[in-house]
Amino acid sequence: MGNCLHPAELSPSTQNSSQLNSEDLWNFSYDGNDSFPDVDYDANLEAAAPCHSCNLLDDSALPFFILVSVLGILASGIVLFMFFRPLFHWQLCPGWPVLAQLAVGSALFSIVVPILAPGLGNTRSSALCSLGYCVWYGSAFAQALLLGCHASLGPKLGADQVPGLTLGLSVGLWGVAALLTLPVTLASGASGGLCTPVYSMELKALQATHAVACLAIFVLLPLGLFGAKGLKKALGMGPGPWMNILWAWFIFWWPHGVVLGLDFLVRSKLLLLSTCLAQQALDLLLNLAEALAILHCVATPLLLALFCHQATRTLLPSLPLPEGWSSHLDTLGSKS
């Protein structure tokens, strides 16, 4: 069979036996003066050999999954604590309820990372794996949609600006994200104790729907935001979507959406890879894109902290001080 680094090699005895059996069958089946073109059995056997790829996210990657999960939970918890503590003034951030939901989505993703991690034993059920993929992609879809709304509406998402707007958008966006996870939830399960998507002809429609959803949310949505920003600026129609550091979130999921779409095209035979090296490169890109997407649960709280720090540093000097603070400062000034 070979391994993931070296293709399978046939021993001389295997090659000779294969040639002998084929020649015997040929002579037995046809008896006459018909001439047939020569067949290169060695080339045929080499072409039929399986293509092996190294899986970067195998059992040896378990420490990576655990570390990212722990860091993501801690970072998201700290960010949520700072959002709901008036001492840090993070509630001054424009659209802070939406930003808090981004931290919630990141925390949910961090929690299910160990469920889908390899190397934790062979006791996971298909139901648990389906639930894991549901939360995995549901939280990611919700975060992407929340970022799109935050960029499009910006300061209008404040609780005092439009009452009920934030609540209605939140319910709607999380509902859409839940619906988008149905295909991958139904087309995933446990195989050999590992959680993995199930690829079969019966589930091809679900796989196609999931690939299209990832392409639309992770790839087309940020491209649309950038396009709208550039178009409005070129036509002088206003500032367009609100661009800020939070847009860096899409860097972690954009490759996943692209490579997942390519993988579906290859599995559906709509895109043919002529060499084993091309297939190995695609498998490597799939693993790297998945690892990058997993890292978003650590990066998202950091992006939120940076954004809120910049926003509060800009807004705090322009806000009036409380009466107690102002009188205290006046007393200190008179003493000096």
Curated annotation (Swiss-Prot):
GO terms, molecular function: C-C chemokine binding; G protein-coupled receptor activity
Cystines in this chain: C51-C276, C129-C195
Topological domain spans for side Extracellular: 1-63, 117-129, 188-207, 266-287
Segments traversing the membrane: 64-84, 96-116, 130-153, 167-187, 208-228, 245-265, 288-308
GO annotations of cellular component type: early endosome; membrane; recycling endosome
InterPro entries to which the protein is assigned, alphabetical: Duffy_chemokine_rcpt (IPR005384)
GO terms for biological process, alphabetical: chemokine-mediated signaling pathway; inflammatory response; regulation of chemokine production
Subcellular location: Early endosome; Recycling endosome; Membrane
Assigned keywords, A-Z: Disulfide bond, Endosome, G-protein coupled receptor, Glycoprotein, Membrane, Receptor, Transducer, Transmembrane, Transmembrane helix
Function: Atypical chemokine receptor that controls chemokine levels and localization via high-affinity chemokine binding that is uncoupled from classic ligand-driven signal transduction cascades, resulting instead in chemokine sequestration, degradation, or transcytosis. Also known as interceptor (internalizing receptor) or chemokine-scavenging receptor or chemokine decoy receptor. Has a promiscuous chemokine-binding profile, interacting with inflammatory chemokines of both the CXC and the CC subfamilies but not with homeostatic chemokines.
Family label: Belongs to the G-protein coupled receptor 1 family. Atypical chemokine receptor subfamily.
Protein name, entry field: Atypical chemokine receptor 1
